[in-house]
Amino acid sequence: MIASIRGILIAVAADHVVVETGGIGWMIYAPRPVIAALGDIGATVRLFTYLLVREDSLTLYGFETVEQRQLFETLLSVTGVGPQAALNLLSSGTTDELRLAIATGDVTRLARTPRIGKKLAERLVLELKGKINVKGLPTGAAVTPAVAAANAELSEALISLGFTDAEAAAAIAALPSDAPPDLEERVRLALRYFSAS
């Protein structure tokens, strides 16, 4: 597998770039924000790549970070999600926003992405529930020390009830911003999140 490519940017299109290294120009498909961030033609660039091998083609996909590439691979594991749909999802916002939308079951946000309808958005949430790493994801609002302490307490309570770290983090991310600091009420809200998903 070709893990990354570093070279001179020699061409830019809407959905791909060409990077020359060692006298070879590599056509690399990438999310739109990645293409926009590469800079001008002639710049030295580095992309973390994923090589998709099919019976009739070898296609390279490029990403800004290893985490973004891993998320692309995770998206491809979902039935019905091909490389173009995965690129569209990665182009629809930041990697953290996409991970949070999947972890919190935000089907409406996912379905707004081109080539992703409501059914495929629901399948994404269903098949990736618990597989998306939600540690360190923003929860929307700035977290005060009191809220952070309440979230840590809630996480411990949910884990003691048998939920995984990822499930606990997803439930915490889904809490409303005006959730009371009381542990009992926060557990009740988190359990409502699990029963709704």
From Swiss-Prot:
Stretches the record annotates as Domain II: 65-145
Coiled coil regions, renumbered to chain: none
Intracellular or extracellular location(s): Cytoplasm
UniProt-annotated stretches for the region Domain III: 148-197
Region Domain I, annotated ranges: 1-64
Keyword Methyltransferase: no
A Pfam family matched in the record: RuvA_N
Principal location class: cytoplasm
Subunit (UniProt): Homotetramer. Forms an RuvA(8)-RuvB(12)-Holliday junction (HJ) complex. HJ DNA is sandwiched between 2 RuvA tetramers; dsDNA enters through RuvA and exits via RuvB. An RuvB hexamer assembles on each DNA strand where it exits the tetramer. Each RuvB hexamer is contacted by two RuvA subunits (via domain III) on 2 adjacent RuvB subunits; this complex drives branch migration. In the full resolvosome a probable DNA-RuvA(4)-RuvB(12)-RuvC(2) complex forms which resolves the HJ.
Described purpose of this protein according to its UniProt entry: The RuvA-RuvB-RuvC complex processes Holliday junction (HJ) DNA during genetic recombination and DNA repair, while the RuvA-RuvB complex plays an important role in the rescue of blocked DNA replication forks via replication fork reversal (RFR). RuvA specifically binds to HJ cruciform DNA, conferring on it an open structure. The RuvB hexamer acts as an ATP-dependent pump, pulling dsDNA into and through the RuvAB complex. HJ branch migration allows RuvC to scan DNA until it finds its consensus sequence, where it cleaves and resolves the cruciform DNA.
Domain comment, as recorded: Has three domains with a flexible linker between the domains II and III and assumes an 'L' shape. Domain III is highly mobile and contacts RuvB.
Protein name as it appears in the record: Holliday junction branch migration complex subunit RuvA
Species assigned in the record: Roseiflexus sp. (strain RS-1)
Protein's gene: ruvA
